[in-house]
Regions:
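Intrinsic-disorder-associated, low-complexity terminal segments enriched in Asp/Asn/His/Tyr and depleted
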Residues: 4-7
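N-terminal capping segment at the start of a domain
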Residues: 9-41
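Intrinsically disordered, low-complexity segments enriched in polar/charged residues with Gly/Pro
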Residues: 16-17, 61-63, 90-92
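Predominant activation on well-ordered alpha-helical scaffold segments within soluble catalytic domains
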Residues: 24, 28, 45-48, 128-129
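Structural signal for hydrophobic packing residues in well-ordered secondary-structure cores
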Residues: 28-31, 51, 55, 97
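A non-catalytic alpha/beta surface segment that caps or lines the substrate-entry region
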Residues: 36-83
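Active-site metal-coordination/substrate-binding segment of hydrolases
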Residues: 70, 77-79, 83-129
Length: 129
C-alpha cells in the first residue's frame, strides 16, 4: 500500500516542468554573491527575500554572533496540507575560497563554469537554487 502511494507521488512529481532559464538565472545571481565563512549576511538577506516571495515563513537565529559571523542560520517553513511526512532540505550559505569576483559563463553545451579562478557553485550554493 505504501509503495502504491509512493508511485502515485512520483507520477505526480514527474508532471512538474522545470523552468531551466529561471534556474540558470537564479544560479548566476546567487553564485555572484560573495559569502565567505562568517560573512554570509548578503546571501542571507537575499535568501530571506526569495523565500518569503515563495510563501515561506522565515526565521533567523543568532548563531553568527556566537561564532564571529554576521548572519545566523535560516529556518524556512512552508505550511502544507499534503499527505505524507514533512520534507527537510539543508544547505549552507558560505562559499569556499577563492570566492571573490565569481562570475559564471555558459558554454555551448549549456554547462556553467567559472569565468576565472574563483570557485563557482562547487559547494552548497548550487543547492540553494
Amino acid at each position: 500500500m505504501e509503495n502504491d502511494r509512493a508511485d502515485k507521488e512520483v507520477a505526480e512529481m514527474s508532471k512538474i516542468k522545470v523552468n531551466e532559464q529561471r534556474a540558470v538565472d537564479e544560479f548566476q545571481e546567487l553564485t555572484a554573491i560573495d559569502a565567505p565563512s562568517f560573512g554570509e549576511r548578503q546571501m542571507a538577506d537575499r535568501l530571506i527575500v526569495k523565500l518569503k516571495e515563495l510563501g515561506f515563513e522565515v526565521e533567523e537565529d543568532n548563531a553568527g554572533k556566537h561564532f564571529g559571523g554576521n548572519a545566523g542560520n535560516l529556518y524556512a517553513y512552508l505550511p502544507g496540507d499534503l499527505p505524507g511526512d514533512p520534507v527537510l532540505l539543508s544547505g549552507h550559505m558560505d562559499t569556499v575560497e577563492p570566492s571573490k569576483g565569481k562570475k559564471g559563463i555558459i558554454g555551448e553545451n549549456g554547462v556553467i563554469r567559472s569565468a576565472g579562478k574563483a570557485v563557482l557553485g562547487a559547494d552548497d550554493v548550487a543547492g540553494l537554487v
